[in-house]
Structure formats: C-alpha cells, structure tokens
Amino acid sequence: MDKHKKENLNSNFIKKYPLIFKKYRPIRKIASGVFSEIYGGINILNNEKVAIKIEKRNIKNKYLESECYTLFSLRNIGIPQVLSFGHNKEYDILVMPLLGKSLLDLFISKNSNYEFKDICLIAIQIIERIQWVHSRKFIHRDIKPDNFLIGLNDPHIIYLIDFGLSKKYQSTKSGKHILYSESKKFTGTITYGSVNSLKCREQSRRDDLESIGYMLIYFMKGRLPWQSVKVDNKKESYLRVSQMKKSILPEELCENLPGEFTDYMKYVKNLKFEENPNYGYLRNLFVQLMKKQGFEEGTCFFSWVNINNININNIKRQMKI
C-alpha cells in the first residue's frame, strides 16, 4: 500500500470517529500491527495526551480485550494505566496515557550507540518490570526493544507495553504451573525469541529473561549474529535462527563484553521450565557492573533525562531507591 493510501485510511478513521467515549479525540496514527492500530490523541476535558488502541471486533482472538485484563491485573510503576476500555460498532478500544519513544527508536536516534550506564540502567529497570509481571503469574512472550517505552512526562521510567500475547503461566487459584509442551505455535519476535519459543515449545518465565538478554546484547553490540539470516520460508527462518542461538556459547555471543553479560546468559539458559528465577541476582549483576565503572545506582540517570527539569527526590521515591 502506498503512502497516499495509508494517509487516506488514517484520515478516514479520524473523520469517522472524531470523538471516542465522548472525550478522546484521535489526532494521528502512531503505530500499527497485524491486528491493531494506535492513534495519538487528547482528552478534550483536560488536554491529557492519550494513546488510543483499536482492534476490529470481528477477529477470532480478542487480543485487545486480553491486554486490557492483563493491564488491570498488573497495575504498577512502569505498566501503562488503563484510562478507558469499550467498543463501538467496529472496534474494541483501549485508551491509555501517551508514552514517549521506544528503546529501539532512542537507540536508532543515538546512532545505535547507547552510553554504557544507559544499558546498565535499562537492564535494571526491565528486569524489575518482568519480575513484577511474573509475580502476578503472567509471562509477556514478546520482549523486544520496541515494547519498552520511556514515559512522556517521566522519561526516567521505562514502561513495558503490548500485552496482547501475554498469558498466565500459573493458575491463581490452584497454583499449578502450565504444562510443558512441544506443539505450540511460535509466539514473539524471531530476533529476540528464545530457543524454546522458536522450537514451538511452551514458554515460561525463563523465555522472557532469555529475550531480555538478547536485547541487552543487541544494545551493546548494535547487532545480533542471526540478524543476517535471510530466507523466504518462515519455518526455515525459525529453524535456522534457533539452531544459531542454540549452538552459540554465551562466551562467544558476549565476546568483548563485560563478564556480567556472559553470566546473565549462562544463568537464564540453564533455568528449568518451571523454575522461579533469581531476579535479585540478575539485577545485581548490572548494579555491580555500574559500580565497577564508577556509577552508583540512585546517583546517575539516563542520558536522555534532563536532571535540571526534574525533582530528583521525587524520582527516587518513584523508583524506590
């Protein structure tokens, strides 16, 4: 579809639905996926900037409805707040506060070169985010740089988004863990997906953590070895990438990186299917790595945060430092 046609579709939606739930005005499309689109807009009652996520009501799997349920269950720092959820004749609609750039967009804007302290701070926060998600008995299943956004008004906070593919790994009532299976459809993104997910095995907490590892290595090196794999057939692509990920040793994958990255990958790759990860150990790897480089947690901030415009004590309270 050419750019002109896309713009027409964009403007047609906004013309057709100029006001959502009598107070949210969509202004422009900011993202789109296989099943959903996201529009930036405002709450006309208070001028709050919002993100309006829509999904066709006639699809079989209600990803947006599932995402809304998950977000309600996960309410906490670094998780998008649900402002409104409902539907019209055509769409299910989820309204959330508008967030800032993704970690991928920020990385690209910095010429694919984050400062070292930024990567350590990113690691600490995203491990905390996934620990919280797991503590609520959910797994995310699509960890990637695109799904972590900084706050619009609180750029010191990283938000984990897009819970449409998340699922419960443990029953809240019985406490029973989901069963291991080797006959699942692949869920996630090939570049960051775990070896087990690419082999169509049931995912658990270890898989989210493995994906985080690949993401951090990508930020350190600017590229992952399997990103050069190019095949037309998806199944062949899954097979090739999973073989590369399985065969490459952590020491080789993390070559020329601080040993903490190797330690991280060794730990998460050795986790059992139902094992409860030691998040404190993983988080502390990067706290100690920062200290080695002369940075103290709580006294340094992301390079994109203008500390002259923010209240440091308020940040520390928010981050529980």
Please annotate each region the language model reported.
Residues 37:
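Conserved N-lobe ATP-binding subsite of Hanks-type protein kinase domains
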Residues 43-65:
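ATP-binding glycine-rich loop module of kinase domains
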Residues 69-77:
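Structural motif at the C-terminus of the N-lobe alphaC helix and the adjacent alphaC-beta4 loop
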Residues 81-92:
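Short beta-strand micro-motifs within the conserved protein kinase catalytic domain, predominantly
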Residues 99-108:
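Structural motif in protein kinase domains
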Residues 122-123:
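Activation segment signature within eukaryotic-like protein kinase domains
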Residues 134-152:
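Catalytic-loop of the protein kinase fold
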Residues 151-187:
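Activation segment/activation loop of eukaryotic-type protein kinase catalytic domains
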